[in-house]
Amino acid sequence: MKIQNIYHLLQAALLLLLVSCTQEEFPAVQDKAQQLTISVTDGGYTSAVENMKTRVETRAVENGYTTEFTEGDACGFYMVRGGKPVYSNVKLTAEKDAATGGIMWKTDGTTLAAGMDGESYYLYYPYQADMAGKTATPAEGAVMTDAEFFKPLIDGWQPGDDQSTHAAYTASDLMTAGGSTTGTGNTIHLSFAMKHRMALAVIEMPKTVYKFIDANVPDYTVGAEATFTGTAKPLRMADGTYRYLVHSSMPTIEGCYDGGNREFTITTSASHPVVGEYKRYKVDGAQAMAVSYTHLRAHETCADL
């Protein structure tokens, strides 16, 4: 009986010792972390022509060359602490905030917490389920830029040949960013300003400008519609231009307009493509031909011209 009592006492003492070690030597690191909220914006494309003149780090973004994220867009999130991954390729999906009408980013069920020392945050778009071998491994204590962290992904990225739909175009528009944190208390806000990792070719077509004799009717401009005959299929924009994303080299873009009567070929210049920059390529000088027009008939609109 005495032996059994001594045995039970030893068990209890050992259990207390283990609990003591756990509390003192293995603190719950994650308990000190705070919940994350995330916002994502796009830094846009800059003009290759203007950058050749200035080449400054700060950049003014032209309207129309930024991406507005919409409901359903998805990014991949990474967090590294002390050189070791904490979160890897967590899917963040854009959802509409019913209260504000803005965009908020939701995880696929993972609760994100951060705020410890030695953390770095990385984001890329568009999301890919398979990211094996597409990120670099930072050395312990080292801090990588997003370009360094995602270098394998960027180097191996190939924009699609056919970018003629909005979905196909955005699927080719690789962006990455490093995160910066603000906030105190129980919630940390994490902001990402995305940088485009491809170059952008903007194709301008010749235009027809309808000038109405009636001064109350403003001029109406119509860009020629192109048919692309090669493998490269750019996306037509609302302003009549075409856009095509390229990597380190641009393929020859071939096409025709005016019912097939006029053909054109576009090849890259020596100064383009450059990552994050756009350059305009003007077919036949993108000249505007003026046509005088007396008036619109009762049943006509400018779109009928």
Stretches with model-predicted labels:
Residues 3, 11, 21-297:
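Sec-type signal peptide cleavage vicinity
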Residues 295, 302-305:
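Single conserved hydrophobic/aromatic residue that forms the stacking wall/gate
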